[in-house]
């Protein structure tokens, strides 16, 4: 009996050489620490600008007032989402679902086009990690100095500097926890209650929870999150193709690697442009050697590009040995920017954005729902009318007190028992019990479809809700 055999194929990148491999060989061990060297250059400036933008946006939004309320507040307790002058309720949360879909397809589009630039430039894990590394460098020294210090005995001076570092780290973490919870609880009141010891248990719990998570992720786990725990790192390859922009090493130009003096001619020595300085590995936050080829751990941060460009400039060589490029370009072929996968993601993204704005335009500044009395289908009142009882729930989504008029269509000579003009406070859900009465002889059927109508005082909008009027069969 014959057995089918699966062919084994060597998929090791052509540029990988065990003898010259400089990557962190134990980077898959969570206990192994990567000492990231500082890198300076064009792409690192862009990263800093992007990081500062994200930090300022995240930190300032909960402090922005709008009228008497916080501009953006996801009030879970009251089931409201305040977005500047608009208040959204659970029935409007299709908007939130559309936002998530837009964010997802936006990420798919960017990843297919530019690779993992989100990870390298704007991902909160990356931004907070590099902010923590900045404090670490200022208080403990460069990567080489930190590595040497950690391998020696702890001194009093080093212990003090490490203590200051952890105080700075936890201060940032605590501010992050406050800010995040401030999107769900009014920020000013949260801070006042916390520092006057008047806060409730759950807000304090969540502030400390997110503070500890931030401290652990950015201070200790760092690239472990990117390598082992982030699902995006695993499924990103499904969106990559050979025209996706990646951080790539030009092996045709760089090999054979080797040290040399600045005045030496590399061609006479049989060498490529790579001087094997190892800086591209030392500045990599995930500890990989980009010269070994494309690896899923690469977050497209460009740190190795800046490090290599600085080295090429010092040597008098052309920059771009490591650069943002594509697999097709590295193999000497042309890159196709417009391709079916990218156009497909872009088309879906535009459709979702269009649907979102259509949905926003259709959101009414008020809402109404109608509940029939479940205990009694109908009753005959003293006037001989068939009477049905309802509860109207009217929501004022605006920021001002509103006056509404109520009416009904579908019944002739109907009697309205209850208020027909109501005032509703901002954000209030008003429960209005009322009844309708009608002459049974003027009803054509046992069940009549009716429309409750809500209009504002200036007749700028009308809301219609369908219900039923029932008489004796």
Task: Say what each PLM segment does.
Residues 354-377:
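Hydrophobic alpha-helical transmembrane segments in integral membrane proteins
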Residues 111-126, 217-233, 264-312:
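Cysteine-centered iron-sulfur cluster-binding motifs in ferredoxin-type domains/subunits
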Residues 439-473:
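Terminal connector regions
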Residues 385-390, 431, 445-450:
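Short, solvent-exposed loop/turn segments enriched in Ser/Thr/Gly
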Residues 394-398:
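Asparagine-centered strand-capping/turn motif at beta-strand->loop junctions
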Residues 416-441:
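Intrinsically disordered, low-complexity Pro/Gly/Ser/Thr-rich segments with frequent PxxP/GP/PP motifs
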Residues 2-248, 254-256, 305, 318-350:
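Membrane-embedded alpha-helical bundles of multi-pass integral membrane proteins
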Residues 399-413:
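Short acidic, flexible loop segments centered on an aromatic residue
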């Amino acid at each position: 009996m014959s057995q089918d055999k699966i062919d084994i194929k060597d998929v090791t990148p052509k540029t990988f050489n065990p003898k010259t491999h400089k990557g962190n060989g134990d980077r898959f061990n969570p206990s192994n620490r990567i000492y990231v060297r500082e890198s300076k250059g064009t792409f690192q400036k862009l990263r800093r600008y992007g990081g500062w933008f994200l930090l300022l946006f995240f930190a300032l939004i909960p402090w922005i007032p709008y009228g008497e309320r916080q501009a953006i507040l996801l009030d879970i307790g009251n089931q409201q989402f305040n977005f500047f002058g608009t208040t959204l309720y659970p029935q409007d949360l299709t908007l939130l679902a559309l936002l998530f879909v837009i964010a997802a397809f936006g990420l798919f589009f960017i990843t297919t086009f530019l690779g993992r630039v989100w990870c390298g430039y704007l991902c909160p894990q990356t931004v907070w990690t590099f902010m923590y590394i900045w404090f670490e460098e200022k208080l403990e020294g460069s990567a080489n100095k930190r590595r040497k210090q950690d391998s020696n005995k702890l001194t009093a001076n080093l212990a003090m500097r490490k203590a200051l570092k952890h105080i700075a780290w936890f201060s940032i973490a605590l501010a992050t926890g406050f800010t995040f919870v401030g999107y769900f609880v009014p920020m000013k009141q949260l801070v006042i209650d916390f520092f006057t010891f008047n806060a409730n248990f759950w807000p304090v719990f969540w502030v400390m929870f997110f503070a500890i998570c931030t401290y652990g992720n950015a201070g200790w786990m760092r690239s472990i999150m990117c390598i082992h725990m982030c699902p995006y790192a695993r499924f990103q390859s499904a969106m990559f193709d050979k025209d996706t922009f990646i951080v790539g090493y030009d092996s045709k130009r760089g090999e054979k690697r080797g040290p040399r003096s600045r005045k030496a001619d590399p061609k006479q020595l049989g060498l490529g442009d790579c001087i094997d300085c190892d800086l591209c590995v030392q500045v990599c936050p995930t500890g990989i050697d980009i010269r070994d080829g494309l690896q899923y751990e690469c977050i497209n941060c460009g740190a190795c590009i800046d490090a290599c460009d600085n080295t090429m400039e010092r040597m008098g060589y052309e920059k771009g040995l490591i650069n943002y490029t594509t697999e097709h370009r590295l193999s000497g072929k042309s890159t196709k920017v417009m391709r079916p996968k990218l156009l497909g993601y872009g088309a879906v993204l535009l459709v979702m954005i269009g649907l979102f704005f259509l949905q926003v335009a259709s959101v009414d500044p008020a809402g109404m729902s109608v509940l029939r009395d479940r205990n009694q289908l109908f009753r005959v009142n003293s006037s001989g009318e068939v009477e049905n009882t309802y509860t109207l729930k009217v929501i004022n989504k605006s920021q001002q007190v509103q006056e509404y008029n109520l009416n009904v269509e579908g019944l002739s000579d109907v009697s309205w028992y209850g208020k027909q003009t109501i005032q509703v406070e901002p954000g209030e859900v008003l429960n209005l019990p009322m009844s309708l009465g009608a002459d049974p002889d003027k009803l054509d059927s046992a069940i009549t479809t009716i429309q409750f109508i809500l209009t504002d005082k200036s007749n700028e909008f009308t809301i219609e809700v369908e219900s039923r009027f029932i008489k004796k069969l």
